[in-house]
Amino acid sequence: MSTTAAIQASNISVTFGHRTILDKIDIEIFSGQVTALLGPNGAGKSTLLKILSGEISSTGKMAYFGVPQALWQPNELAKHLAILPQQSTLSFPFIAQEVVELGALPLNLSHQQVSEVALHYMQQTDISDRANNLYPALSGGEKQRLHLARVLTQLHHSGDKKILMLDEPTSALDLAHQHNTLRIARSLAHQEQCAVVVVLHDLNLAAQYADRMVMLHNGKLVCDAPPWEALNAERIEQVYGYSSLVAAHPTMDFPMVYPI
């Protein structure tokens, strides 16, 4: 597994009014890993993801693949970094495949190539049967899978420098598609050396698919470790205020969290 730092962020702080959202966060995101951002509501997970993606600014320093954030041209960075937000608003009556093809805008591809790449990722995300449906007619879960196909399309020609950020990508999905989405993310990390950052609420999903867990609490980074080190009853009580039992999965090598 690569130890290349795809993102380096130091002394990241964000304040809204009198409220501190993030407080002096230092974090590196590595190629070849799935990093899960965890914590209760309001902990700062989505804000940190937006800072790491460059969507919002903060104090501190940021670099992608060793190059300071300020030196990246937006069009060039878009070839290497894609983000799936919690909600993607689109009111125009595009057909589904056209939405996915929007991900190819930063790429220098022919119309035929764009169509082929879009359909490839629609098949991966199990949404190809809706290719000719109008976007507004899709269900919430179908839209979420469609936008996942769009951001995967965006990274199609990113080579060995790619970052995928997913903000609660399983929130509208059924059980099978939750696991399919995270299997895709893990495959990108382990097979294509993508740096994957995913915001999740389900600790058991995070334990199964993440290489590394970063926990936030009241805007502070309180844990950065592999699942077996990160998950214990004391820490879950500290971060979530909830009593739990942590035990090994009966057949697979990851910890499970059981409420008590």
Curated annotation (Swiss-Prot):
InterPro entries the UniProt entry points to: AAA+_ATPase (IPR003593), ABC_transporter-like_ATP-bd (IPR003439), P-loop_NTPase (IPR027417)
Keyword Phosphoprotein: no
Xref: CDD domains: ABC_Iron-Siderophores_B12_Hemin
Assigned EC number: 7.6.2.-
Protein known as: Hemin import ATP-binding protein HmuV
UniProt function note: Part of the ABC transporter complex HmuTUV involved in hemin import. Responsible for energy coupling to the transport system.
Membrane topology listed for this record: Peripheral membrane protein
Subunit text: The complex is composed of two ATP-binding proteins (HmuV), two transmembrane proteins (HmuU) and a solute-binding protein (HmuT).
GO molecular function: ATP binding; ATP hydrolysis activity
Family: Belongs to the ABC transporter superfamily. Heme (hemin) importer (TC 3.A.1.14.5) family.
Intrachain S-S bonds: none
SUPFAM superfamilies, alphabetized: P-loop containing nucleoside triphosphate hydrolases
Compartment(s) where it occurs, according to its Swiss-Prot or TrEMBL record: Cell inner membrane
Annotated residues for binding of ATP: G39, P40, N41, G42, A43, G44, K45, S46
GO cellular component: plasma membrane
Stretches assigned to the ABC transporter domain: 7-243
Keywords: ATP-binding, Cell inner membrane, Cell membrane, Membrane, Nucleotide-binding, Translocase, Transport
PANTHER family per UniProt: HEMIN IMPORT ATP-BINDING PROTEIN HMUV
Pfam families xrefs: ABC_tran
